[in-house]
Curated annotation (Swiss-Prot):
Residues 206-224 have a biased composition (Basic residues). One of its GO terms (cellular component) is egg chorion. It comes from Drosophila melanogaster. GO terms for biological process: chorion-containing eggshell formation. Residues 86-108, 196-244, 279-306 are annotated as: Disordered. GO terms for molecular function: structural constituent of egg chorion. This is Chorion protein S38.
Length: 306
């Protein structure tokens, strides 16, 4: 088998694969499935023919190996053609299967709760609910439900009560449906500031103030201000300083500083370096730090920024 024969066999395989892919990409639904399958079969037959021609010659380039590779590529092309005939947006992974696609179906995603404050996975997004509804007004698909329903945390939950869903031009009685439920969020997004230690004067152990350059309020973290600026009252007058979650960068720096404070003097010097490297939303930190004379929480002390 010469080099030119091998190249021609490989080119025939590539052309067959390309034609199969082009034929399968033209179909957008089940009606184009037969054409895609025919294209895949044609591609497989063409690849097999090329493989036979290449394998029959045999020679220094291994005709048998070339034939096996051609058969493999033909099978891949047929698989791509088969995958192309499925319609977009399968409904096999949803807890209920709609009877029709017009939206006025009996299996609307409306459920009744057994308790309140839960979260229901409701296509296309979860809804946090406040109270059970007595009547639900549904506009058009995608369904808009107000007030939102809730279910128990027993997947899958069977709803025992019935709901009336108002569709134009008549009301439709909705039977109980199967729904998937999820657990509530693992963390609370609105934390209690008193428990977290935000803004409690100098007792806030690095959460909001940064003990590296203890400064006025946030000057150790580069929030600027020698007792002035939008950070408000500092730790000396016992007021509430700016919370550490004011911005993402500030929160990250505050948590990093809190970790560094656990390691003694080396941590304090490293914290001072962190404070000197970054600039806050109110400009760079001034070099004239006002050192704290008040007590520092947990036996710490106020060290100057280097």
């Amino acid at each position: 088998m010469t080099r030119s024969t091998y190249i021609w066999a490989l080119a025939a395989c590539l052309i067959a694969c390309a034609s199969a892919n082009y034929g399968s990409s033209q179909g957008y639904g089940p009606e184009s499935g037969s054409g895609a399958s025919d294209g895949g079969a044609d591609a497989a037959s063409a690849a097999a023919a090329a493989a036979g021609g290449a394998g029959g010659a045999g020679g220094e380039y291994g005709g048998a190996n070339a034939g096996a590779g051609a058969l493999e590529s033909g099978a891949d092309a047929a698989g791509v053609a088969q995958a192309g005939q499925s319609s977009y947006g399968s409904d096999q992974n949803i807890p209920y299967k709609p009877v029709n696609t017009k939206g006025n179906t009996l299996t609307s995603s409306i459920t009744y709760p057994q308790n309140k404050g839960e979260i229901l996975i409701h296509r296309p997004a979860p809804i946090i609910v406040k109270r059970p509804p007595t009547k639900v007004l549904v506009n058009h698909p995608p369904l808009v439900v107000k007030p939102a329903p809730v279910v128990l945390h027993k997947p899958p939950a069977i709803v025992l009560r019935k709901v009336y869903v108002k569709h134009h031009p008549r009301r439709v009685k909705v039977e109980p449906v199967f729904v998937n439920v999820v657990k509530p969020p693992a963390e609370k997004y609105f934390v209690n500031e008193n428990k977290q230690g935000y803004g409690q004067g100098s007792q806030s152990h690095g959460h909001g103030h940064g003990h590296g350059g203890h400064g006025h309020g946030h000057s150790g973290h580069g929030h600027g201000g020698h007792g002035a600026g939008p950070h408000g009252p500092g730790p000396h007058d016992g007021g509430r300083a700016l919370p550490a979650y004011a911005s993402g960068a500030d929160s990250a720096a505050a948590s990093a500083g809190y970790q560094l404070l656990q390691s003694g003097n080396q941590g304090l010097s490293a914290l001072a370096n962190i404070a000197g490297e970054r600039e806050g939303p109110y400009g760079p930190a001034p070099s004239h730090q006002h050192y704290s004379a008040g007590p520092a929480g947990h036996g710490g002390y106020a060290a100057p920024a280097y």
